[in-house]
């Protein structure tokens, strides 16, 4: 689906309110395989260098074409739902295996949902729900 209307809008990075940016970075990086983009200290009004001892209160993380902003105790309520797409059921199964090995909080393993999509649900430390979705497998020989 292409919704380009010439407005210039090209991306969306949800801001997740978290209790601790440092703990959330560790969860997303170690359990879910995200990468850390940048960190910011509001108290010091500056970007932080990697592995600096100062605790961040804002960060950007990403994996693939998905990016989230993590904001400590601000910018919205905890516990929102995010829908992440992958192209194939095999990619979803691979993420499930990886995240299970890394002790991610899998709420629902992959299954076909009543609406026909192959999905799983994973929850982070602040009750944000990641619904990861793929189209269902097709029968062999189907076009």
Predicted regions and their residues:
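Vicinal oxygen chelate
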Residues: 18-22, 63, 82-129
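Core segments of cupin and vicinal oxygen chelate
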Residues: 6-8, 15-66
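Conserved beta-strand in the GNAT
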Residues: 68-71, 121, 130-131
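A short acidic/small-residue loop/turn micro-motif
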Residues: 75-76, 114-115, 135-139
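Short hydrophobic/aromatic beta-strand or adjacent loop that forms the aromatic wall/cage
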Residues: 56-58, 79, 117
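A short, polar/charged loop-to-alpha-helix boundary motif
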Residues: 48, 137-143
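Short, solvent-exposed beta-strand edge segments and adjacent coil->beta transition regions
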Residues: 9-13, 77-81
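Residue-level detector of high-confidence beta-strand sites
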Residues: 37-39, 109, 132
């Amino acid at each position: 689906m292409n919704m380009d209307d010439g407005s210039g809008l090209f991306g969306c990075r949800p801001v997740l309110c978290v209790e601790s940016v440092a703990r959330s970075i560790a969860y997303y990086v170690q359990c879910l395989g995200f990468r850390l983009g940048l960190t910011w200290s509001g108290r010091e009004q500056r970007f932080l260098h990697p592995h600096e001892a100062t605790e961040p209160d804002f960060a950007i993380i990403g994996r693939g074409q998905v990016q989230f902003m993590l904001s400590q105790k601000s910018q919205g309520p905890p516990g929102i739902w995010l829908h992440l797409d992958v192209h194939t059921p095999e990619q979803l199964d691979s993420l499930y295996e990886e995240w299970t090995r890394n002790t991610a909080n899998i709420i629902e393993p992959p299954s076909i949902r009543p609406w026909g999509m192959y999905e799983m649900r994973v929850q982070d430390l602040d009750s944000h729900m990641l619904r990861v979705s793929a189209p269902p497998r097709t029968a062999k020989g189907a076009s």
